[in-house]
C-alpha cells in the first residue's frame, strides 16, 4: 500500500535564467515561493524540465543549495541527480544529504542513444546511491531509452532500503503502475504519475498516489490527485 507521505502534487521547478545566460537566483526563489503558495506537497529541482542538461556542475551545486535552503523545510525537496557515472551520482547524493534535502530522483544510467546500464549495473548504481541515506524516487522516463521491467523495480524496492518511490512515465504507464503496485505491495511506497499528467486519470485508477509534472498548473492538478 502506498505511503500517505508520498501523495499529492509534486511539480518540477523550472530554472529561470537572465538574458545573459546566468542563473536568476532571485527568480528561482520566486519560483519556489509560488509553488509553496499553491500548497504543493513537494517540489522537484534539477529535473529534465529544469534544463538540467544546460547546467554546469557549479551551477547545479548553486541551485541545490539555494533551493533547499530557501524552501527551508516548508515542503520536501526532491533533487534530481541522474548521471551515467555512479561516483558522480553518489557525490551529488551526499551533497543533498549534507544540505538536509529529503529526497533524490534518478533515471537509470545512460549516455546518448546506445550507452545504457545493464539491469545489474542499474541495481548497483541505485544501491550505491542509497548508501547516502536519502529516499530515492526512480524515474522511469522514455528519455533514457532504458527498459525498467517491473520485476527489476520490485527487486530494487525490496533490497535497497532507500528506494521507495517510482515515477512511471513510459509507454503503457498505467499498466506498469498497476503491476508495480499489485506485485510490489507495501514496498511501493510512492507510485507517481508523470509525463505532464497526460495519463493522469488512468494512472490514478491504476494506483498512483502522486503526480509530478511541470509547474504550470499545480493548482489545477492537485485537487484531482487528492
Regions found by a protein language model. Give the residues of each.
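Active-site beta->alpha loop and helix N-cap motifs at the rims of alpha/beta catalytic domains
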Residues: 2-145
Amino acid at each position: 500500500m502506498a505511503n500517505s507521505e508520498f501523495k499529492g502534487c509534486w511539480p518540477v521547478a523550472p530554472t529561470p535564467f537572465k538574458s545573459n545566460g546566468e542563473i536568476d537566483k532571485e527568480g528561482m526563489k520566486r519560483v519556489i515561493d509560488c509553488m509553496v503558495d499553491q500548497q504543493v506537497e513537494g517540489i522537484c529541482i534539477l529535473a529534465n524540465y529544469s534544463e538540467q542538461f544546460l547546467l554546469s556542475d557549479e551551477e547545479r551545486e548553486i541551485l541545490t543549495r539555494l533551493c533547499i535552503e530557501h524552501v527551508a523545510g516548508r515542503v520536501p525537496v526532491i533533487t534530481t541527480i541522474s548521471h551515467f557515472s555512479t561516483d558522480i551520482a553518489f557525490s551529488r547524493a551526499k551533497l543533498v544529504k549534507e544540505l538536509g534535502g529529503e529526497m533524490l530522483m534518478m533515471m537509470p544510467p545512460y549516455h546518448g542513444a546506445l550507452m545504457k546500464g545493464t539491469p545489474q549495473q542499474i541495481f548497483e548504481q541505485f544501491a550505491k546511491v542509497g548508501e547516502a541515506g536519502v529516499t530515492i524516487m526512480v524515474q522511469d522516463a522514455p528519455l533514457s531509452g532504458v527498459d525498467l521491467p517491473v520485476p527489476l523495480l520490485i527487486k530494487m524496492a525490496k533490497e535497497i532500503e532507500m528506494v521507495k518511490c517510482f515515477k512511471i512515465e513510459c509507454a503503457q504507464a498505467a499498466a506498469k503502475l498497476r503491476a508495480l503496485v499489485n506485485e510490489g505491495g507495501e514496498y511501493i511506497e510512492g507510485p507517481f504519475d508523470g509525463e505532464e499528467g497526460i495519463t493522469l486519470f488512468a494512472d490514478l485508477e491504476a494506483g498512483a498516489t502522486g503526480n509530478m509534472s511541470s509547474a504550470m498548473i499545480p493548482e489545477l492538478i492537485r485537487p484531482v490527485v487528492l
